[in-house]
Amino acid sequence: MARKNGKDGSGSASDKGGDKAAETKSQAGWRDHPPSFAGWARAAIAGSGTAPSLSPHLHPVLPPAAPGIVTVEPGRSVSLAAIDPDATGGLDKAEAKAALDAQRARIKHLQEMLYAERRHALLVVFQAIDTGGKDGTIRNVLEGVNPQGCRVWSFKVPSAEELDQDFLWRYHLRTPGRGLIGVFNRSHYEDVLVVRVKGLVPEETWRERYGLINDFERLLTLSGTVILKFFLHISKDEQKERLEARLADPEKHWKFDPADLVERKAWDAYQTAFDDALARCSTPYAPWHVVPANRKWARNVMVAKTIASSVSAMVLA
């Protein structure tokens, strides 16, 4: 039976002193190693009784990604250099607009069903190098979707408050509830990408984060959230053309940031970081999808098809 302290409790002075010492030690440990969502996720998964397999009633079986998209096989290495960023998945540019319109209509209708059922949530993650097309993809693919059921989050440099928490805190706060679609424009993967390339944290810190991210995503999955992760893959030459276009067109000047030129010098370092993140964090429950993104019209259709097919599986599960 648990010991009670206070007026009607027992517990000697020495017991209380021991409890106080233990409490102080525990508090010190929390300061040195503050609790995190990822740590809680690991404990929750261990006690869920569902590991290692997923609960079928919580996680629908999703169809393969659209043709042209390369899905990273869990446990396998990946090299972006070996993936053609100009691939179109057999799409014809002349038919792309009609194809995109059709997929957007599907997403709009299926999102309403997802919202009405409130059984699952969808989290769509977009990562890419600068000028990779995250904003354009989100804008073109999700045009017409009811904003009451879809929220886009663009993550910038962490605030002072966010830096006082564990690295996953700000992302978990913005994950979608059941019936909703959440979109991450950049995401928790920045904490194993830009922080690695820029040396913002020790190597041992960012290396440990791969496993913490997998635990975090597994927790979301076990809670009924389907995670679609898209990496928009462009070539170095394509990035150069897009940066030059931003400088040449006054209407695109707002997109240009001189820091982009500095980041471009770290192209190879970013490619290595991308390869590692894609390989280490592509799991059976949240695989990475590499989207050839040099051709924007093909990119949009491939992403739209994959989202539409996934939401269809969710509402029919």
Model region roles, listed by residue range:
Residues 2-6, 37-104:
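Charged, amphipathic alpha-helical linker segments immediately N-terminal to NTP-binding catalytic cores
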Residues 2-7, 90, 194-212, 220-272:
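A glycine- and Lys/Arg-enriched "phosphate-lid" helix/loop adjacent to the NTP-binding pocket
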Residues 4-7, 272-317:
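NTP-dependent small-molecule kinase module
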Residues 4-12, 16-24:
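Asparagine/serine/threonine-enriched low-complexity, disordered tracts
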Residues 92-95, 150-210:
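Conserved nucleotide-sensing/catalytic segment adjacent to the nucleotide-binding pocket
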Residues 108-115:
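Pre-Walker A adenine-sensing motif
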Residues 120-121, 178-181, 224-228, 287:
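Loop/turn-to-beta-strand initiation segments
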Residues 125-142:
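Glycine-rich phosphate-binding P-loop
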